[in-house]
Swiss-Prot record:
<feature type="binding site">
    <location>
        <begin position="626"/>
        <end position="633"/>
    </location>
    <ligand>
        <name>ATP</name>
    </ligand>
</feature>
<dbReference type="InterPro" id="IPR016151">
    <property type="entry name" value="DNA_mismatch_repair_MutS_N"/>
</dbReference>
<dbReference type="InterPro" id="IPR007861">
    <property type="entry name" value="DNA_mismatch_repair_MutS_clamp"/>
</dbReference>
<keyword id="KW-0238">DNA-binding</keyword>
<dbReference type="GO" id="GO:0005524">
    <property type="term" value="F:ATP binding"/>
</dbReference>
<dbReference type="GO" id="GO:0140664">
    <property type="term" value="F:ATP-dependent DNA damage sensor activity"/>
</dbReference>
<comment type="function">
    <text>This protein is involved in the repair of mismatches in DNA. It is possible that it carries out the mismatch recognition step. This protein has a weak ATPase activity.</text>
</comment>
<dbReference type="InterPro" id="IPR036678">
    <property type="entry name" value="MutS_con_dom_sf"/>
</dbReference>
<dbReference type="GO" id="GO:0030983">
    <property type="term" value="F:mismatched DNA binding"/>
</dbReference>
<dbReference type="InterPro" id="IPR027417">
    <property type="entry name" value="P-loop_NTPase"/>
</dbReference>
<dbReference type="InterPro" id="IPR007695">
    <property type="entry name" value="DNA_mismatch_repair_MutS-lik_N"/>
</dbReference>
<keyword id="KW-0067">ATP-binding</keyword>
<keyword id="KW-0547">Nucleotide-binding</keyword>
<keyword id="KW-0234">DNA repair</keyword>
<dbReference type="Pfam" id="PF00488">
    <property type="entry name" value="MutS_V"/>
</dbReference>
<protein>
    <recommendedName>
        <fullName>DNA mismatch repair protein MutS</fullName>
    </recommendedName>
</protein>
<dbReference type="InterPro" id="IPR005748">
    <property type="entry name" value="DNA_mismatch_repair_MutS"/>
</dbReference>
Length: 885
């Protein structure tokens, strides 16, 4: 806690002194200071919040001679403002009133109950249902000479309690952050290591928080173990320092222990297939190149019935295991689900899963004592549904070990379910303060207080009837309002009949309101009962939360099993709906894909042309040639995606597929200037190529698309040739090498492990039709001018390009020209100049095309469609007979 000198408070009111003390402990955080029904911000916090949230900035009086800037948000809508702020990378300290205004002398006691930061979100209103939020700490390890030898990473999903550690090489930091995607990154004060731009909100914390010895002990205390050997973390150093800082920070933001952080996973780079940032981006696993969430592999696969399954899918896609045994186990489960008997059908299972709540995040809030009443009722209803869900699984588990494990983990925690059933009302209110949360019969005292409060109506009816009889006033009424409480209302003309025991409470224009000793006694009892009932309910609810804490490990077990079951069922649904097959695996070097299809592109088009892809010890590099837009990049990406899907455990879009070991997937596809990093397009391209040449192994899958195109023709050709040779001679990796340098098609003559394949197309006049079929052998041309014409390049430009192309081809045939002169003018005849504006292609339309343009297929009857087909055939034959191409 920060200590301020007495001078700092001179001239300030007691309330502002209280605020300044709290603000001093959170100097870099916006303080939401509770005042009645609002959270107020003061001074510079108010100005900043007004700017970020579009709030009204006011100024009320002064404190110590300084005008007090103010801005506020209503407490019932605070979550929407918090969501906006954390998206902007801001942190907010929530300062609540914890004292009773009625008994407080001076300012009501307040304290910060939690700090909301981008990486420590747990409230459902602040979280995306299908995205995990990670808080990450990084600590650099140095040798005795002060040279950085590794970077220790610790990252925590506070909403679920999942904690992971890793130690990586310094040059792997960008790839690790791209994979983890942390929302907030903790680094030591004074550290010189720069966090890559766009990696996440960065927060500096005291360097001593990263002490390795203290961090190791803090980890042991958190996990309640004597040593970390059982977690495989015995050799970690800097990662333990990072974990210590992370746990300290997370606990401080929550203001309490992290009871649900009870396990640890140490990640090793050899455990998963390596995917660098460029590969994740180019394969569009969870985000398109345009930055949208769809269409991606994730959006295609995500038919999960629970949000837990959707989040697990995202994790699996970014963490494909290298060991095929994990994939085979998952695919075995998918097969069992597809072959399930009628009483345990996949549709019935998925229908049951749709009723399941987000147990994972509810458990996290339960551990932090922030679970709301409907969290608990959802948890109860989910646990109550587990026996029926297990019955559906029981008919399947004999065929799949992983389903057997999931089934066992879905055993509902009986004591936890009993407590939730007895304590929580069937349909509780959203907030405890509203009452109606604790079930009737759970607490006798609460039931009695509720009876008093809820029976007010009958008492008032009886009292009104008695008083009408006693006084003879037929229109006498007994009523209640929040300002004056209970009262007896008598119209002005009947006041002479009022008995002596009536005491005037309020005078109105046309009536008088009275109170009697009997009504006053009842009022005190009723209002007191209501207040006491709410207080009792709050105390009981807090006690229920405490009583549920021992069941957190069981809740986490159930959540994990539900997520896995849901994801496996989603994989089975995709396999059935999209005609996918189970891949096989071998220990031999090779990849065999028969009639493979790009899963995402196939879903976007009416017809997709399937293609084969084959690698082996004698076939390691495929030189892919063919026209632009012919499908080279699609073919390359589909090969990588099918391989990744296989190792994730999904079925794959192919007739059959078999994979040998794969350790990494690299892609060098497309590029753009890195303006922030000061790198040109070509520099980005060469940097990615260098990483591949340095790191690819015989078990790596490499996608190289048009390497060398960012420089001069001969430089690019020379680089492409040398890179292809290196990949064959030194890396010996599986390589898909797309190029427009037709000189490279001679490479198989030198390296038998290289093979030529091409994407086919056919010309029609000066037009082109892409067949998207992969065939053996090299292509004969690139059809670049035809593609340019399809793109809408003006006809005069196309004509000029054809002439210049002929000249360049003639020039390149000369053995005396070391480099093509792209800017020398070819000889052009005068008559050619005169017709430079002529159209590049004949503009006579084909009669069949004209006929097709006038047709609305939706208006055709079956017989009309058949007649039209014959008519179109006649037009085509007639047109060809007239000598047209």
């Amino acid at each position: 806690m920060t200590t301020l000198s007495p001078d700092a408070f001179a001239g300030h009111t007691p309330m502002m002194q209280q605020y300044l003390r709290i603000k001093a402990d959170h100097p870099d955080t916006l303080v939401f200071y509770r005042m009645g029904d609002f959270y107020e911000l003061f001074f510079e916090d108010a100005a900043k919040a007004a700017r970020l949230l579009d709030l009204t900035l006011t100024q009320r009086g002064a404190s110590a001679g300084t005008p007090i800037k103010m801005a506020g948000v209503p407490h019932h809508a605070v979550e929407q403002y918090l969501a906006k702020l954390v998206k902007m990378g801001e942190s907010v300290a929530i300062c609540e009133q914890i004292g009773d205004p009625a008994t407080s002398k001076g300012p009501v006691e307040r304290k910060v109950v939690r700090v909301v930061t981008p990486g420590t979100l747990t409230d459902a209103a602040l979280l995306s249902d299908k995205n995990d939020v990670y808080l990450l700490a990084m600590c650099t390890g140095h040798n005795k000479r002060g040279v950085a030898v590794n970077i220790g990473l610790a990252w925590l999903n506070l909403a679920s309690g999942a904690l992971r550690l890793a130690e990586i090489e310094p040059d792997q930091l960008a790839a690790a952050l791209e994979r983890i995607r942390p929302a907030e990154i903790l680094t030591p004060d004074g550290a010189t290591d720069a966090v890559p731009a766009g990696a996440g909100a960065s927060k500096r914390v005291p360097a001593w928080h990263f002490d390795i010895a203290s961090g190791t002990q803090r980890l042991c205390d958190q996990l309640d173990v004597a040593s970390l050997d059982g977690f495989g973390a015995h050799s970690l150093t800097s990662a333990c320092g990072a974990a210590g800082a992370l746990l300290l920070y997370a606990a401080a933001t929550q203001g309490q222990q992290l009871r649900h952080v009870r396990s640890l996973k140490v990640e090793n780079e050899t455990e998963y297939i390596g995917l660098d940032p460029a590969t994740r981006r180019n394969l569009e696993l969870t985000e398109t190149l345009r930055g949208t969430e769809s269409p991606t592999l994730y959006s295609l696969l995500d038919t999960c019935c629970t949000t837990m399954g959707s989040r697990l899918l995202r994790h699996w896609l970014h963490h494909p295991p290298r060991a095929s045994v994990a994939a085979q186990s998952r695919q075995q489960a998918i097969g069992a689900l597809l072959d399930a008997p009628a009483n345990a059908s996949l549709d019935a299972l998925r229908s049951a899963l749709r009723q399941i709540a987000d147990v994972e995040r509810i458990t996290g809030r339960l551990a932090l004592l922030s679970a709301r009443p409907r969290d608990l009722s959802s948890l109860r209803d989910t646990f109550a549904a587990l026996p029926a869900l297990r019955e559906r699984i029981s008919a399947i588990v004999a065929n799949a070990d992983s389903l057997t494990r999931v089934d066992a983990a879905l055993a509902p925690p009986a004591e936890c379910l009993d407590l939730l059933t007895s304590a929580i009302a069937p349909e509780p209110a959203a907030m405890v303060r509203d009452g109606g949360v604790i079930a009737r019969g759970y607490d006798a005292e609460l039931d009695e207080l509720r009876d008093i409060s809820e029976n007010c109506g009958q008492f008032l009816i009886d009292l009104e009837a008695r008083e009408r009889t006693r006084t003879g006033i037929a229109n006498l009424r007994v009523e209640y309002n929040k300002v004056h409480g209970f009262y007896i209302e008598v119209t002005r003309g009947q006041t002479d009949k009022v008995p002596d025991d009536y005491r005037r409470r309020q005078t109105l224009k046309n009536a008088e309101r009275y109170i009697t000793p009997e009504l006053k006694t009842f009022e005190d009892k009723a209002l007191s009962a209501q207040e006491r009932a709410l207080a009792r309910e709050r105390a009981l609810y807090d006690a229920v939360l405490q009583a549920l804490l021992p069941f957190i490990p069981e809740c986490q077990r159930v959540a994990s099993a539900l997520a896995e079951l849901d994801l496996l069922a989603a994989f089975a649904e995709r396999a059935s709906a999209l005609d996918w097959v189970a891949p096989t695996f071998t220990d031999e070097i090779g990849i065999e894909i028969e009639q493979g299809r790009h899963p995402v592109v196939e879903a976007q088009v009416e017809q997709f042309i399937a293609n084969d892809c084959r690698f082996g010890t004698e076939r390691k590099l495929l030189l892919i040639t063919g026209p632009n837009m012919g499908g080279k990049s699609t073919f390359m990406r589909q090969t990588a995606l099918i391989a990744l899907m296989a190792y994730v455990g999904s079925y794959v879009p192919a007739k059959s597929a078999c994979f040998g070991p794969i350790d990494r997937i690299f892609t060098r596809i497309g590029a753009a200037d890195d303006l922030a990093g000061g790198r040109s397009t070509f520099m980005v391209e060469m940097t990615e190529a260098a990483a591949i040449l340095n790191d690819a192994t015989p078990q790596s899958l490499v996608l190289m698309d048009e390497i060398g195109r960012g420089t001069s023709t001969f430089d690019g050709l020379a680089l492409a040739w040398a890179i292809a040779r290196h990949l064959l001679a030194h890396n010996a990796c599986y390589t898909l090498f797309a190029t427009h340098y037709f000189e490279l098609t001679q490479l198989p003559a030198e390296f038998p492990q290289a093979a030529n394949v091409h994407l086919s197309a056919v010309e029609h006049g000066h037009g082109i039709v892409f067949l998207h079929a992969v065939n053996e052998g090299p292509a004969n041309q690139s059809y670049g001018l035809q593609v340019a014409q399809l793109a809408g390049v003006p006809a005069p430009v196309i004509r000029a390009a054809r002439k210049h192309l002929a000249y360049l081809e003639q020039q390149s045939a000369s053995q005396h020209t070391p480099q093509l002169d792209l800017f020398s003018a070819p000889p052009v005849a005068a008559d050619d100049l005169e017709c430079a504006d002529a159209p590049a292609l004949p503009d006579t339309p084909h009669p069949a095309l004209e006929k097709l343009r006038d047709i609305d297929p939706d208006d055709l009857k079956p017989r009309e469609a058949l007649d039209l087909l014959y008519e179109l055939r006649t037009l085509v034959r007639s047109h060809d007979a007239d000598g047209h191409a």
